[in-house]
Structure formats: structure tokens, C-alpha cells
Amino acid sequence: MLILRGAPALSAFRHGKLLEQLSQKVPAVTGLYAEFAHFADVDGELTADQQQVLGRLLKYGPSVPVQEPTGRLFLVVPRLGTISPWASKASDIAHNCGLQSIQRLERGIAYYVAGTLSDADAELIAAELHDRMTQRVLGQLEQAADLFSHAQPKPMTSVDILAGGRDALAKANIDLGLALAEDEIDYLVNAFQGLKRNPNDIELMMFAQANSEHCRHKIFNASWDIDGQAQEKSLFGMIKNTYQMHNEGVLSAYKDNASVIVGNVAGRFFPNPETRQYGAVQEPVHILMKVETHNHPTAIAPFSGASTGSGGEIRDEGATGRGAKPKAGLTGFTVSNLRIPGFEQPWEQAYGKPERIVDALDIMIEGPLGGAAFNNEFGRPALTGYFRTFEQAINTPHGEEVRGYHKPIMLAGGMGNIREDHVQKGEITVGAKLIVLGGPAMLIGLGGGAASSVATGASSADLDFASVQRENPEMERRCQEVIDRCWQLGDENPIAFIHDVGAGGISNAFPELVNDGGRGGRFELRNVPNDEPGMAPHEIWSNESQERYVLAVSAVDFERFKAICERERCPFAVVGEATEEQHLTVSDSHFGNTPVDMPLDVLLGKPPRMHRSVTREAELGDDFDPSELDLDSAVQRVLNHPAVASKSFLITIGDRTITGLVARDQMVGPWQVPVADCAVTATSFDVYTGEAMAMGERTPLALLDAPASGRMAIGETLTNLAASRIEKLSDIKLSANWMSAAGHPGEDARLYDTVKAVGMELCPELGITIPVGKDSMSMKTKWSDEGVEKSVTSPMSLIITGFAPVTDIRKTLTPQLRMDKGETDLILIDLGRGKNRMGASILAQTYGKIAAQAPDVDDAEDLKAFFAVIQGLNADGHLLAYHDRSDGGLVTTVLEMAFAGHCGLDLQLDPLTDSKGEVPAILFNEELGAVIQVRQDATPDVLAQFSAAGLGEECVAVIGKPVNNAEVTISLNGEVLFDDDRRMLQRQWAETSYQIQRLRDNADCADQEFDLLLEEDNPGLSVKLGFDVNDDIAAPYIKKGVRPQVAILREQGVNGQVEMAAAFDRAGFAAIDVHMSDILAGRVDFEAFKGLVACGGFSYGDVLGAGEGWAKSALFNARARDAFQAFFERTDSFALGVCNGCQMMSNLHELIPGTEYWPHFVRNRSEQFEARVAMVEVQKSNSIFLQGMAGSRMPIAIAHGEGHAEFASEEALLEADVSGCVALRYVDNHGKVTEAYPANPNGSPRGITGLTSRDGRVTIMMPHPERVFRAVQNSWRPDEWQEDAALMRMFRNARVWVN
């Protein structure tokens, strides 16, 4: 084993944070130093040249001064006996660089901790420094040799029920954490006594996962009686009623990994499978919809819990029908009180929590980062979501109870697209190959399905921890590329059947696959790719290692499928074959036995149906009279409540522009304020149709009136979706996520009554279907605190997500008040018709109350009329701004509109009341409704349209107007009741987000961004162009019909190739899909290409540095090096590197003439992934892409974690600047070059973010022009832009240059 020291592992900021954390736990700690340590398992000796290559491979990341380490060593390495995802990618890179004798590379972090430390101190320190699920702490570097030795496989065990009977199985149930119900134990004893043999542990584990509440939804399929009355329908039966009543537009419901609804027709853009040239195929582009929860894992390990939650939902979409494409994501979180240190709120009481779960603040620091990181690396934009905190002591008939979310809700959802012919699964032929696609098995996530089906605290802490999976999004991206290549084959798609691997691992996925296809299966356990050879059979079969799919591929299609996987470098294995008989056999060649041998109907047949016998409880509530409240204090409390406050800290960490198909993200207007009501994507690059999604939830309401909370969730979803241009209400389809503390007094009945209200009443009345959903029935946390039994129980929680096809994405409304449209009015539409019910409002919660009367949807007809009128007004161009009313009430609605519009407000409440005592209820009630901005001359017509639809004076009123200063006033009868400065109110609203950002990221950056809100004259984003945006300078060349070829180059983990191809295609190029594996295998060189474009993403998951592994596999592979060098030396060639491609090309500068002063790109100064819209200014340079654009300023999409330009020296920086190599700089909203955050999102010196070679043929940049070449792709754009955006000129310049 070779040991190679690496660079320091912590930036100054991270070092300070960790040192503070350690010294809080162990005061004896006085110092800390950390560096990477690399270990190479080598077969034989490396030559001097090979040692040099290895040395260069392992030099990556920022240049930080190396220290000589002192102090006690804590060497954190991957868990012994496993192969880490880092190792498999780094080893791949080494092999691609010709280092075949390296069997494996591994990496650890060597922490040297100074201070006089006892063994007990060392244990505490070790616990802080590693994740015990996937890592080990060693005391010496040499001990890392154990990483390369493998344990012997463990044998299976059986449970002796033939001799020990039922008791033997009952004991195994506890030991193995199976969570079997009493009647299931009886069922299994009878089944195996019938088979005349003892069950093996692998069979029991498989049965427990497949039949867990998590997988089987027993409560939703149960029979019920309530208060002694038998109920007619199951919960699921009532949900399905919505489909029976209204199934138009639904193509697949209740039977696949996601639901499918009818989409629009468009030119679906992808590479031709034969020629590899990108082009558009006109066809129906149907919409997938899915929303999952990952609550249990997120409570235990928030980053990985939320990350694998998003990953699992993405796989559900990809595994729909015969393969589909995920498109846009959403994330939601509900947790208990945050209690941010130094920013505790008056309503946040400390109640404690069990040791095994993480507190709410840490969940909200780590969980969102996990969800965002997976989406970012996979390449899916995260476009909407919600965040709520709730934890309150409530008086009940049984005494005081704490209600809240110690077991959090972590919601991961999204939408995708699928071809019409692939919506239904195909046929599994007898003898079809049963394949696992994706990553290897590892001992992680064992028993997750069963673990998430019990109340937190009812199983052992070790089993809880073992049930959390770990993530590798770059692997999932490779799998998706394989699925994409398959569906792009159309009729020749080799995938007959596909499922994702989730709860229960392949022990659940393979039986489900063959059973759904009407077949059985014969499997060989040792064919399962396995990075942990010491596992026992049940661990190999049931672990929940992520990023895996199971597929059936017929023998005739297998070779084609195999070739696709090899090109994409995606691991796969044939584990079995389909049989005629519906029997499951798993053999084990290592031990020469058959661990599983059972009829499928024993596993998946009809275990006993659950029956629920429950009683209703009185609804809860308390007295809350807001009439005397001080408005200033009430507004401040409400604006600080996390459900109301800015969600910026959740949003800027998530890429919102990847795919180039995003038409509406969360950030609104020139000041990019996070207040959008819905998310909208374009169907494709050639149309204005699209898809919209939005959410609704009012979970605390369920304590007062559970059915009302369900109706309000649906109502809020619809008032959010009303902002997009949807043909008719019934085009909207809903996903319902149900959470309940089943078994807690009154909760089962509340659940039943809510499902009934939604499924049997409101949805049928609205003409809306719920074709998909998910349930989580163990929303309770129990623990013992110094002998006191404690529990926190969630309210019944229904979270609704709505999806719909959109007729015109240009017509999406936002809350931004327009000050450039003359005199305007603000009109309130109050669907509560003046009832002003305050139940469970944010205002009540901030005073420790929940009030008594719940807002509700009193009449479905009002909701239908509202939706129809808003759509009509939008179509006619009457609406300048729109925002729905929800958390925080009317005052929040109008303030958010003012924040987005950078203006003040003059509100007159006279049309709503003449009593000052009613004002707080008017301002803070959360009845359904919206506020719209219209031109004053249109106001009479708008009011008349509402009145004609049955929404007259008791629900629609003019309540004031925006004003062109920063003053916000609220008046009644001429008396000013509230008067404040918009900037100060916006800082109050932004402070919760700022406080979390300060704890999580570089505090200096957080401070800079927060202080920007005080700037009086911030003009926001703007455009200043030195050219005509509508002038297509490439048109004369396109007319000639000659399309020069450009190589759209990608490496494993790259995810931005399609939009890049679309931009070049539009400019008149033939865009050709080229994978690095094509270059390394000699299938492609660059001779035929005029252009070479390296695209954005996460090549090799950024292992060995961002873009560096990709670059080094080009530099140190002889064939690849020759191809790149020959291309760059041609004078008729051009190249572009964007984001990850920019990082990659900056590391190739030794091959690119005239680039000796280029920097390389390292971690952002904020220490965070930054996804924003930034202003850039084009510099005077020779770049062929930027000719005629010098001096132009425009917004551009940025999304990267490592975009800080690090030059070799001060001299190199100066030289780059004076030699004309700098092509693009960040500027602030005033047009000044800046290093200040967030205008310069990575802190690059002198604002440098784009460079070119001396002759201008090769240009690199961190921002993403390929995501914003159409006007509709921009989060904000000037009104006068039509189809093209400013940055389309870049691509057309390249086309002009070629001729």
C-alpha cells in the first residue's frame, strides 16, 4: 500500500467552525489541522512516470498552505470492508490515465487534534468527526491497509419454527427488527409449516420489507369502523373515487412508480440513436407526477435522509412505464421549533428530544443541503417547495399534549416526461434477463421499509441508524443516461419492464418486477454487484444501497442494452431470468445452497387484511382574541415565523436553471425575491406550452378541524396554480401525501374523515382527480427523559401537490408589483367571504395559541369561479401581478408583493370594515384568496367580471395601491394604523433565512447579502446591449443548409449537454453527442468537428477536483491527449467550456495555445453551492463567441460550488487581465465590476468569470449562457424581449465565425 499526503482538507472558515464544535464538546482541545490522506493498493511497483501521473492526479482543489501536523491523529476512512463511491470513481480515473496496476485508490481525512486528551475525550472527538454508518476512525496511517483486505462472506441462518413454533419467529421478529404484526407472524408460521421447512433469515427479511406498512399501505387498504359504525370504503377506495368520477387526462394511475397525465405536443429534443445528431421529434410529451416522503431517515441523518429521499423519487420517475425522464423537482420540510441560538422566538418553548434524532435546526441546516446536492448533481432543477415549523403544547381531553414534528416531514417530488408508447409496462418474456442497473450492494439502509413503519423510538437506536441509506447521485445520473438512450430508441426500446430499487432493496424490487409481469424468477445471489463481500445473504438481498433499478430485458435485446451501458460507463449485472412458474428461487454459488425457495404468493399473496376500529375525539382549540394586539409587534412576529419568512436559504443552494426548460422558478423580478406561487417548465425548446406544479398544506389546522385542513390544502394548491395559464380547472391533477400518528387517540378518525372530505366530496365537486400519493402512518416520537416519558405527536398532515399542462408559459403571473404601468389598484379576492376565521393561523401560533374556528372551503363553486375568472383576466392581459393569500394572511401577501416590486404600499381597509378591533383579524386571517394588481382604468371591468361569476362585494374589494417610495401604510377611516419602511420589513422577513445561512455558510457572505437589503437605490437586474437582440446574424448561413458539426462533449456525471446542443442547433450547427468513452475507445476523434463544447455538470461527481478528473483522463491517456491536442492546434477549430466544462478546460491549458495565464477554479468563497441570476459585463477580447458584444451587460444563470478563479500568482492575474484574456466579469446592479457577494457569487478576483485564449478560438466561462438563450428561460427579462434572449448572440457569433 502506498500512502500519499494530500492537501489541507478544511478551508479557514470550515476549520474555525469545526474547532469551535470540538472544543465545545471537549474543552481540552486547543488546536486542529486536517489534510487528505490517499492510499493506493498497487499490484507490483509503479514506474517513475506512473508515480508522476499519480502525484498529479492527487493534486487537486484550492492551494492552501500545508502544515507539518502535530497532535493526536484521528484518521477517518471509509468503513473497513467497503469500497467507497469516491474510490470507485478515483480508481476509474486512474485506469483511464493508464495506471492499470493500481487496484484501488482510497481517501481518508487525517485530523490532528492538539490538547491533552483522555481516552474518553478521544471517543467524543471521534464521534464528532465521522459518520459511523459509512466511516471508521483509525489511530495510525498504516492501519489504512485494512481498507484493502476483505472479510469472508457470512452464511445465512434459519429460524426453527418446526421445533420452536410461533415463539421462535416472535423472537426473530425483534432481533432482526422485522416489525411484523401478530397476524403476520401467524401467517408465516402456517405458510412455512405448509412448506414443511424452516424459513431462512433472508426470506423473513424479504417478507418484512415487502409487507411493511411503508410498502403495502396496510392502513390505507384496511377495513374500518368508527364509533362502532362500519365504514363503507377503505381510505384508498375513497381516493380512487376521484379517478372513478373524473379520469379524463389520466394515462396511468395507482399502478406504477409515478402517475402519468396528458401533456402537450412539442419537438422533443434528443440525439438520434443512430447518427448521434441532436434534433427535435414532434410528439405528445406526457407528464409524470410523483411526490415521496423520506421522514424517518431525515430525522436520523438529515443530509443523507433528504438526499436519498430526492434520489428515490427521481428513480420512481425514471422507472415509470418502460423508462421516462425526470424534469423538475420540489422539496418540502415540516419540523418542530428551530430555536436558532441568539434568535429564539417568544413562542418557541424548549421541550427536549430523544438522543437518536437530530434537532429541528440541524435538520434544516443539513436536510435541505442533502436534497439540493442530489438534485444538483443529478441535474434536475428544484423549483418549488414549502417549509413550516410547528411545535406547541395543546390542551386535549386527555390533558396537555405536545404536538409537533420531531419526526419531520421531508417531501421530495417532481414531474417528468414520458413517450406515449412507453406509458404502460411491456411484456416479460420467459427467459428474459433480470438485470440490476446501477451501483453496488453495500451494508446500508438495512430494514428501512420496516423501520420507517414504526413510531420513532419504538425500535433500537442501532437499527434506526442502520436503516438510513447513503447517496451517490453521479451514479444515478449514469443510470438515467442509460434509460434515456433506451426510451430514445422508441419502438426498439430494450426495456420491457423497469422498477426502481427502494425500500427493501432488490428483495422487494425483483419479486415485484416479476410478479407485476406475471412471471417468477430464478436468481444467483453472487451475481449481485457487491462492494462489501463480507455480507450475509440477507444483507446482500435486502440492503437499500441507492441508485439502483431492476429491469427485464429480452434475450434478443440484451446485446444492444449492454452496449448502451458500456458507453455510459454504467454498471449492470444479469442476476436472474424470468420463469413461467410464479416461484422465487435464489441460489448462492458461494455456499452451494438455496437461501430463497418459495411461491411468490406466499411473499406477495394476501397476508391478513388489517381492520381499524377507532373512535372520534372532540376537536381541540383555545380562546384567541387578536383585536387588541399591537400591530407592529404582530407583524414582526409573523414575518419572523419560518412558515412566512423568506425561504432564500433553501433556494439559492439548489440549481434552478439546469435543463434550459425552466420558465418560472421561486425567485421573482429584478430583485430576485423568493415569492413565486408555482413552478413552470417549458414542454421543449420550440414551443410556449409547458407544465406547472404547486403545493398546498395547512397541517396545524387538523388539530381544530381535520377535514378543513384537507380542503384548505387543496384550495391553496389551486390558488397557487392559478398564477399559471391553465386551460381549465379539471386539467389539474393532484398528488396527496398523507401523514398521521396512527393509533394515537382520535388521529385515525381524523385521517378517515379527511380522506372522505377530499376523496368523496371536494375533489368530485371540483372535477379534480388524485391519481398518485403516498402515506406515512407513524408520525410520533417517544422517549424517556430522566425517567419522564415524553412524546411529540404530529397533527394529521395532508400535503397536496398539483400538476397541470400549461397553454402559454409567457403568461405566468408573479407577485412583483409593477411601478411602470401607470396608476394601478390592488384588489383582494376573499374566498372566506369576510368570515376572517383565525384558527391555527401563524399569528395565533406566534402567541402560543391555535384559536378555535378553522378557515375552510365553504363552497367549491366559489373556488371554481375564482379560478375561471383569474384565467380569463390573465388571458386578456388585465393582471399585472398576482399573489395568493396563505400563511401570515393578507399583510404577508401584500408585503411580499411590495418586496418583489421594490415599492411601498398605501392600504385602505375601509371597504372591509369600519371597526378598528376587526383589523388584526382582517390582516392576519388565512382564508383562501388572492391579491391582484390591475390598471385603475381596468378596475371596474375586473370587478364586474368577478361579480358576474358570483363573487360580489362581500368577497372582492379594492384595498389600496402600490406607491413609488419605501413607505408601507395601513389606514382605516383616515387614521394610519401601521406605518413602516419596506426595507426594514423586508429585513425582518429575511432574518430567519439569514440567521440559518450565517450558521451554515461563510458568515461574511451572509452579512453582505443581508446588508444589501438596506440599499436605497438598488436598481435590480437590468439589460444594456450594444446589439439588437432580435437580429439573427447567423440566418444567411443557416439558409445555405450547411450545418458545421460541433461535438457536444460529456463525461460521466455531466448533465448540461441537452440545452447546450439546443443552443448550437438553433444557431445552425449540427450538434453531435460525444461521450469521453467514445474518445478513449477510439470510436470518435475530433477531425470532423469545427467546434468542441465541454458541458456543465459533475464529471466523476467532482472526485479529484471539479473538472480535474475529466481533464486528467484527457491529459494522461495517450489516445485522448493526441485527439485534444490535434484539435486545439487547428486554426479552423473553436471550443467552449461552460461550468464543469470550464473547470475541465482550465486544467487542459497545457494543450491549448495562448492560455498560459488561465486560472483553475476552486470552492466558492461562500463555501456553498450558489445558484443565482448574476449580472455580467462582456469585456473587449478576441473571443469569437463575444464579438460585437463588448460593453454589453445582462443577467445570466449561474450554478456552481467551485467557481472561484484561482490564479497561479498575482503576476498571472495581472497578465491575464492586460493580455485581453478576460472575456466576462461579474458586475453589481449598478454596473460596477465587483468582488462582493452575492453579485459575485464565488468571490473571484476582479469579477473574472470568463476567459479566452489569445486568438479567441477557445473560451471558458463559469456562468451558463446555454440555459438562457430563449427569453422565456430567464427568471427576469425585459418586456420587449420576444423569442430570443441576449445570450443567443454568442452561439450565432460562432456560426458566423465558421464561415
Curated annotation (Swiss-Prot):
Reaction(s) this enzyme catalyzes, per UniProt: N(2)-formyl-N(1)-(5-phospho-beta-D-ribosyl)glycinamide + L-glutamine + ATP + H2O = 2-formamido-N(1)-(5-O-phospho-beta-D-ribosyl)acetamidine + L-glutamate + ADP + phosphate + H(+)
EC annotation from Swiss-Prot or TrEMBL: 6.3.5.3
Ligand binding (ATP): 305-316, 384-386, 676, 886
The keyword Magnesium is assigned to this record: yes
Keyword Transferase: no
List of residues binding Mg(2+): 677, 716, 720, 884
Glutamine amidotransferase type-1 domain: residues covered: 1046-1299
Pfam families for the chain: AIRS_C, FGAR-AT_linker, FGAR-AT_N, FGAR-AT_PurM_N-like, GATase_5
Region (Disordered): 301-327
PANTHER family: PHOSPHORIBOSYLFORMYLGLYCINAMIDINE SYNTHASE
Oligomeric and partner information: Monomer.
HAMAP family noted in UniProt: PurL_1
Family membership: In the N-terminal section; belongs to the FGAMS family.
NCBIfam families cross-referenced by the UniProt entry: FGAM_synt (TIGR01735), PRK05297.1 (NF003672)
Protein name per UniProt: Phosphoribosylformylglycinamidine synthase
